[in-house]
């Protein structure tokens, strides 16, 4: 049997798997798995250079299903291609604890490169992986051994490409001339509510051409020869990324809904029996023929042979380049130097600098200790102060640069940084003003969901921003970030706490961290030992001022308000303890004995001070405690004036303690 015939059989049987899985659970999305089946057949049956027996192979092609709602497309092809995804798991689609969740999830399913579902994120992730691949080649390839030379493919639909994050990411990909990236556009002219022309009229392919992509259009998206030829041209292109518009029929194989918005979801599954007959499939559900099984078993063996050839080259590279090999190993295992905290120089006792400015010295010290540390910014390196000196920028002509210039594209920055983290090897970060963290929130949420070891630098953290006014004063942002599960949010008080914050972010390999830094200068709190401050951040909270005699009042604070709390405590008396809580999440993870030593239950007289909304502090101060916060938007005036006007002063903290009967 000719390969073309067997691939068509595979495409139709993949359609059958999708129909049966979605019919069995009465939910899911049929449109893409049926409409793009021939695309899947060519990718997994012919084009992708992967090793299904090892889905972590370093030089594998990356395939990202950006349109994650079409997850049965991916699960069906991963099963057929021989990944560790048994048919029983396909049958368990969308069931509790299965390997086939409703949308693809990184770490849950072999062969799934990243979590997708929120449309457009996968395009940004793919751009990040393509950047990481170029970085890896620049850092590790030699003239004798090319160990990184794979491609990145993303399958996206109309919904993905209508999202702003995809537009931002694609614009940057074109600018960087990422010739290892191919975006496959499942162009079926349908969205969920209606035909696509009800909400868009531009030429998408022309838009991508303007971004700097090589573009082509396949009029019949079910013509596998045309798809294969286009993919070959994309792989051969060494000048720019490729965009292939593939005209498909949504829900092809179910005549009752094919080509209509009704074919998007699970509705067509009720025609499952008739659809199987139309596709030439037997009555048996979840049917895969012996011929298709044999074809993919043979292909898996061929891919294994190619992998063995790469392994031999890789072994020779390791032998010839032991230092590069050791660096690569450290990146893969996400090693952090044991003495990382000591690699950051201490600040002068009388230093008076913004924590963002302190971060400049810190990240440059850390970059020397961690050669795979990457720092990016959304056109704000000069303000966020996270530019790494003497390592260059990543550009289309310099793939070894370690600074990423994202432009004013916060959302894409979040998705691209996620893609670099998914790739492994590098430790990426991004930076913008704290108030713009909401522009990237979906990407931040996904990084937390997947436990990606990245960190974000969010500066200009409060009403102290001043004259720019309430549009740029993030009173609610820190609290809004703290409620994202598995995201550590650290708001350091001074330069030494900031050193601890950066190190905490890098030491954490099971999730993301956000650093909330000041625009305004803050004093170095040298009355507290340096190591106490640095190591205290690692625990999330610590005693910054020990009471004398009986403990009568605890004041908790974070960031720039720690100094305010310390000054207020001096006025309130010697029986006042001040606790610095730069990171609630880290503090809450400490064992009960440590938390009790810092916040003893026996002392219920508590107050908290932070220049932001007060809500989350109430879990520490209790029903009778007081929070001196800012539960309103700010105003335009010099920062000190705004702080005073909104109650962020020593006198007001003392006053509020007295009014609540909390005075020591």
Identify what each model region corresponds to.
Residues 4-15, 48-50, 87-108, 381-395, ...:
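Acidic-glycine-rich active-site phosphate/pyrophosphate-binding loop
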Residues 35-175, 387-388, 420:
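Cofactor-binding active-site loop characterized by glycine-rich and histidine/acidic residues
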Residues 314-453, 531-543, 549-550, 556-559, ...:
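Non-catalytic terminal/interface segments that mediate subunit docking, oligomerization
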């Amino acid at each position: 049997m000719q390969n073309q015939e067997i691939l068509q059989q595979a495409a139709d049987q993949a359609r059958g798997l999708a129909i049966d899985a979605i019919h069995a659970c009465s939910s899911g999305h049929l449109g893409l798995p049926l409409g793009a089946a021939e695309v899947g057949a060519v990718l997994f049956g012919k084009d992708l250079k992967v090793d299904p027996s090892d889905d972590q192979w370093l030089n594998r092609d990356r395939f990202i299903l950006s349109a994650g709602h079409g997850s049965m497309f991916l699960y069906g092809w991963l099963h057929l291609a021989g990944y560790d995804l048994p048919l029983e798991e396909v049958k368990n689609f969308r069931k509790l604890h299965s390997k086939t969740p409703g949308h693809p999830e990184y770490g849950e399913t072999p062969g799934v490169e990243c979590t997708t579902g929120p449309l457009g994120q996968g395009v940004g992730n793919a751009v990040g992986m393509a950047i990481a691949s170029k970085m890896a080649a620049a850092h590790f390839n030699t003239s004798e051994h090319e160990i990184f030379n794979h491609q990145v493919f993303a399958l996206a639909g109309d919904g993905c490409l209508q999202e702003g994050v995809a537009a931002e990411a694609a614009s940057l990909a074109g600018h960087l001339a990422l010739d290892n990236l191919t975006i496959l556009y499942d162009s079926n002219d349908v969205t969920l509510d209606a035909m696509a022309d009800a909400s868009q009229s531009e030429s998408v392919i022309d838009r991508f051409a303007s971004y700097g992509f090589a573009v082509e259009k396949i009029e019949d998206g079910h013509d596998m020869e045309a798809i294969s030829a286009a993919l070959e041209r994309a792989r051969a292109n060494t000048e720019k990324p490729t965009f292939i518009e593939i005209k498909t029929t949504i829900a092809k194989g179910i005549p009752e809904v094919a080509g209509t918005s009704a074919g998007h979801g699970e509705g067509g599954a009720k025609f499952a029996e008739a659809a199987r007959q139309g596709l030439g499939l037997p009555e048996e559900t979840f049917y895969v023929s012996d011929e298709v099984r044999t074809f993919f078993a043979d292909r898996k063996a061929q891919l294994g042979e190619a992998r063995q050839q790469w392994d031999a080259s890789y072994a020779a590279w390791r032998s010839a380049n032991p230092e590069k090999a050791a660096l690569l190993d450290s990146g893969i295992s996400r090693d952090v130097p044991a003495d990382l905290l000591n690699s950051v120089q201490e600040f002068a006792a009388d230093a008076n600098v913004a924590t963002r400015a302190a971060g400049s010295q810190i990240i440059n010290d850390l970059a020397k200790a961690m050669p795979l540390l990457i720092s990016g910014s959304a056109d704000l390196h000069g303000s966020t102060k996270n530019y790494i000196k003497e390592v260059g920028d990543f550009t289309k002509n310099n793939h070894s640069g370690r600074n990423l210039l994202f432009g004013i594209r916060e959302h894409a920055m979040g998705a691209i940084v996620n893609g670099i983290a998914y790739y492994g090897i590098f430790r990426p970060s991004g930076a913008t003003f704290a108030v713009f963290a909401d522009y990237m929130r979906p990407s931040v949420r996904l990084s937390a969901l997947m436990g990606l070891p990245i960190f974000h630098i969010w500066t200009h953290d409060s009403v102290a921003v001043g004259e720019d006014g309430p549009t740029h004063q993030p009173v609610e942002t820190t609290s809004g970030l703290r409620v994202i599960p598995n995201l550590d949010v650290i708001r350091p008080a001074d330069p030494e706490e900031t050193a601890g914050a950066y190190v905490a972010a890098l030491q954490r390999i099971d999730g993301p961290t956000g650093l909330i830094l000041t625009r305004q200068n803050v004093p170095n709190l040298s009355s507290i030992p340096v190591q106490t401050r640095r190591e205290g951040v690692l625990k999330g909270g610590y005693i910054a001022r020990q009471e004398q005699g009986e403990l009568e009042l605890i004041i908790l604070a974070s960031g720039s308000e720690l100094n305010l709390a310390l000054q207020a405590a001096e006025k309130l008396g010697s029986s006042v303890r001040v606790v610095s809580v730069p990171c609630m999440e880290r503090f809450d993870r400490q064992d009960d004995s440590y938390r009790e030593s810092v916040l003893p239950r026996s002392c219920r007289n508590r107050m908290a001070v932070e220049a932001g909304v007060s809500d989350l502090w109430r879990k520490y101060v209790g029903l009778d405690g007081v929070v001196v916060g800012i539960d309103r938007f700010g105003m335009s005036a010099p920062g000190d004036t705004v702080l005073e006007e909104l109650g962020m002063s020593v006198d007001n903290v003392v006053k509020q303690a007295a009014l609540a009967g909390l005075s020591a």
